[in-house]
Amino acid sequence: MASVLLAASMGAQADTVDITVTGKIVETTCKIDNAANSAMTVDLGSVGVDAFSGAGSVGNSKPFELSFSGCPTGADGIANINIAATGTADPIFTNGFASTGDAKNVAIEILSGETAMTSNGGNAIDVVPGEDGSAKAELTAAMVQVGDTAPTVGSVNSVVTMNVTYS
C-alpha cells in the first residue's frame, strides 16, 4: 500500500503562476457634492395604495443625481467614475431593494435610464468627468409593487449604498 501511495505522489505535477498586481495613485479623487457626510435622502413622498396596479407597477418615482466635482483631469487624472449600488435585495422582486418600513409588498428600485441597478452591484454605471472635472450621474428612485398583492399602508425605507470607484 505504501509503495502505491509513493508512486502516486511521485507522478504529481506542480505549477506556478506569477501574478502581476498593478495600480495607480492619483492626486485626489472627486468630491461628491450632494452627499453631505456621505449620506443623502431621496424622499419619494406619499402615494395612495390605488396608484399601484399589479406586480412591478410603480406607485411613485423621483429623479435624483450624484454630482461630482474636483475630479483630476489630464494624463494622470480620472478617466471614469464607476457607480455600483449594493444593499439588501427584496426576496421577491430581486431587481429591487428591500424596504425596512412597515408597508408590505413594496420595494425600492434605483434606475439609470430604463436599467435597474441591482442590489449585488449589477448594472453598474459609468460616468466620464468633463474637462472641468465635473460629472453627473442621473438616477431615479421608485416605489415598486412586489407580487400580486397591493402594498399596505405604512412607511417605505431602504438604505442603498453607492460604491464609487475611479479609474
Question: PLM features: what roles do these ranges have?
Answer:
Residues 1-14:
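Gram-negative bacterial Sec-dependent N-terminal signal peptides
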